Amino acid sequence: MRPAPLLFGMLLASQALAMEALDDSTMASVSGQGGISLETSSQGWSASNVSYTQDGRSLNLRDVSNRAANGTTSTSQSILDVQDGQLQVQHSASPQVLAVNNIEMEGSSKSFGSLRAFYTLGATLKLKGGGASGVSGIAVDDSRLSLTDVTFYYRDNGFDLIVKGLSFDTYLDNAYLDIVSGSTGQEVKLNLGDARFVGTVGGISLDLAHGDPTATPATPGAPDPRDTNASRSFGKLNMDLHLGGSLSVASGGASGEGIRIRPDLNIGSSLFQYQDEGILRAENFSGTLRSLGGLTIDLAQDAGSSYAQVAFQDLKLNATLGGLIIGNPTNQKLGSLAIDLNFADDGAKQNWLKLRPGGDPNSGAKGLTADISWNMANSSVSLTDNGNSMWFSGLRTNGTGQLTLDLTKSCAGGAVTGCYAGTQSDMGKGSYNGHFDGLRLGLSNIKGGYSFDGLRVGSADAPLQGGTELLVLMEIFPAYDFNLNGQITLLPGGNSGEGLRYNADFVFSDARAAITVDETGKGLWLAGTTYDMHFRDGSVDVSNNGIELRKGTYWSKLEVSDLRWGDRATGTSLGRLVLKRFELGSTLAVSSGGAGALCVGGSGANAGACSASGGRWEDRGNEGVSVKLKNVFVRDTAIESTSNGVATDEKRNQIVWETNRVNGVAGTGSQLVVDNLSTSDGNPSDPNANTYGFNADLNLDVAPTRVCTNNGGSCTPVTPDPLGFAVNGRIHFKEINVDRLQHVHPSGGAVTSMYGIKVQNADISANLTATPIN
């Protein structure tokens, strides 16, 4: 006997037995009511494997389940009705949890990791037939999709990344879903109409206590108590986006089967905010995201492993972040920031991302590896300050490399399950100690570079001008080619409260950087450069005073094979340069508001006093950027190693200039060495005090300034005052010490020319405004 008909008959019989006639009094109380109400209860579902297969390759989700978040049974209620020609659906459900035990790719022994998501789903939909054409498709009006009370756990090698307090509300009005003819065939097209997306992230934290606290995994209501840092957060995010345009999805990837997503999105009058103690806020965020060829998603395999590829031949991102605030919302504003980024394939320079299971090979079998390639051409970034704009014009960048993402734990606090040990900070040597507690981003063979044509002030087609040299103090070069290896590991919680802490190692090699360069590529170049940088126990916070970056313990070595004047490759060499730095407690602070009103070329707190001193009073408005850099240089108290009489300690402040080398070989020429430089507070009662440091305070504005043209001894003022890139700077320190000044001969060794050099109580102010020469 076939069991299905028998089971169906039994179900019908049970429903018939449950039916009974209503008497007259009961019938009289029944009123007409349309619609359907469905109430369901379920113990959830599970699947041992869910696979997506493409061109014979598979992405597999192992041990997938969706169950009640509390208890054993989940419930939901759905109400369906038809009013005014629309199908109206209201849906609500009890909290649930979705779990995926492993995310794998066929052909790889590694894994992307596992995840769990606690969530509550709700919806109010108003649907009717007829898409944008009014003939076929679906129209969506006055509808809302909500995902609330979300806590997301991502597990990598036994450690957890936790996203808390997550909620999304999507509002759809005048939206359509159609099947249309696209450039590659039939496409499913979602026209967003008047859409709004409201999202909140309450916090992002890490749980680095390996595995589960008991046989039962941690939940939002019963967190893992073993990691004391698990309660700290990277900060909060809020967004309120008004969206328009369309999103199309078609079959077929870059080759063979796959998926092609074609965005044509508009963002208008939106808000984006990050919150720590202070805030980073864009009060009027707008822009577009478009790709004519679309983004393709493919599954593929090469000699390395299986991977999922996201690629795009073209992508244009245009955005304006208006009303930018850094720090306290009642403070001055920065102005607005606009970006115009154009990604486009150009021969071997392509745009793609290959995602592979497993992270850094020294961080376990789980995690994420991404091979990357990018090419961005003819782009720009602009800053508007009190209505005056400045463009970083002709921005170009391209490169390739590999990124890894892992959750790791150091053995510094004692050997525990899953920790990694090391004793070496040099990445080129064994036992590298670059494994720390936190979320680790690894950088491997990132070969790339960037350049931009120069500054334009006033309009996007204004003449190119200088001024980029003023940014070198913040190590922003006008042009830079490099090969980068290293890592940065992040922990939630800053120096206080929310924010982040970090440990990092970066090695730039085979690099070439411009200090100053003109439109022909001629200038002052750092050629054949190696830059080795290390950060320990640093932090980043957003306070009411702005963004505060603390470098913690920092040491670096910049070695320039040739300081060239002219062409980057063939210009005249001024010699070899080595700069070592060892700092403790250095900081960088960025805040809203520039110089405001100030006296240029004189002194005085108001216009009258300024004019009386021979100066010129300028009011640069309440917007702009202020930057404060403090470098605390630490004295090396013992020489651990030497070469030809010169100290070679890794953590030491030292400047070496070498000329007259034999065939350009380091160490074969004559050297001038400024050795063991350090700062001091210059306090006789506490000679070891060193907190004041070497300070550079910069106010950056886009503002008009007075310019005159030299005509045979007279200077004719330019009318009106032209706009320029204005920098008001102040350099100040209490004391700088240099242990010794050495002259070094390649065969005769080092001779100390001076001992115990001191420079005290310097306070130098300057005002520079760069305008076009023509």
Which functions belong to the PLM regions below?
Residues A21-L22, S29-V600, G608-N774:
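N-terminal low-complexity, acidic/Ser/Thr/Gly/Pro-rich segments
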Residues A13-A16:
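N-terminal signal peptide c-region/cleavage motif recognized by signal peptidases
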